[in-house]
Amino acid sequence: MFRKIYTNISITLIKQLREASGSPINDCKKALESTDGNFEKAIQYLKERGLAQAEKKSGNQTKQGVIVAYTNNKVAALAEINCETDFVARTNEFLEFSTNFIKTVVNQEKDFNSSNIESVLRQSQNQAYFETNIDDKRKQLVGKLQENIVIGNLNAFVATNNSIFGVYQHNCLKSTICGLGGSVVELITEQGLNDVKSQILREGANNLAVTYLGLKPKFLYENEVASDVIDLIRKEVQRDFGSKTPQQQNFIVQGKLQNYYSDNVFEHQEYILNEDEPQTIKQYIKKELEDVIKDKVKIGRCLYLTI
């Protein structure tokens, strides 16, 4: 005979409900009491309670969380999934949700960004985990973990026939997909890809993703810098020209511009994974990629996110 608590609800049944739902023990007690011990109805009760709690907590600030980065070689995706505390961000339940979310996004094989997050949340793929759709699972998790959970930034990029993605995850949390920072870098060739070129470029893209997150550039290429920014730098330098000759003045201006490019433009920044042979990103691409695969390579879409 099981030991009874309250009416006719056994401890064993409460434990079974907790294992099935992941809800707190007191919530499981209440659910079974409210449904006269009917296990299936208690599951539904907890789901509905979780949805109600999600609505209540929807205004709570979410400053913690994880960055998830993932690619299946056809699509690369990067997203920020937020919660209220660092404690919840490190729970298995939160990390499992985050991992399944980003994999589901990638498996859609579509371009996504933060403007169409709502359409992503209605996705019903991966029903083994999400059951109905992503947003319903999110709301259930809010009720379970007792914190607001939101999908923040989201970007998914579909590769072309000439491009390949590299991803990097910084400060990984229990998996290589979830961490405190992440980045995506796309490399594009002129003449297309084959197996050998893909392998070389994938390694190169992964290396550049590490560097991209580490340096956090404002621009990829020098020609992306707005002319008014360049004019402002020139004006600042001209204040100290004094009696310098035009040749000296030009030398000073070019030096100042080069310093700005080195600090802010990815192609001019230092490749950080080769300390023995200092080289810029542009030099790395030329020597380690273009000269090896005998094809032109340029940087395409890039993105980084941090918590």
Swiss-Prot record:
The keyword Mitochondrion applies. Gene3D superfamilies: 1.10.286.20, DNA helicase RuvA subunit, C-terminal domain (1.10.8.10), Elongation factor Ts, dimerisation domain (3.30.479.20). It comes from the Eukaryota. PROSITE patterns: EF_TS_2 (PS01127). The keyword Protein biosynthesis applies. It is found in: Mitochondrion. GO terms for molecular function: translation elongation factor activity. Pfam families: EF_TS. Keywords: Elongation factor, Mitochondrion, Protein biosynthesis. One of its GO terms (cellular component) is mitochondrion. GO terms for biological process: mitochondrial translational elongation. This protein may be expected to contain an N-terminal transit peptide but none has been predicted. Associates with the EF-Tu.GDP complex and induces the exchange of GDP to GTP. It remains bound to the aminoacyl-tRNA.EF-Tu.GTP complex up to the GTP hydrolysis stage on the ribosome. PANTHER family: ELONGATION FACTOR TS, ELONGATION FACTOR TS, MITOCHONDRIAL. Belongs to the EF-Ts family. NCBIfam families: tsf. This is Elongation factor Ts, mitochondrial 1.
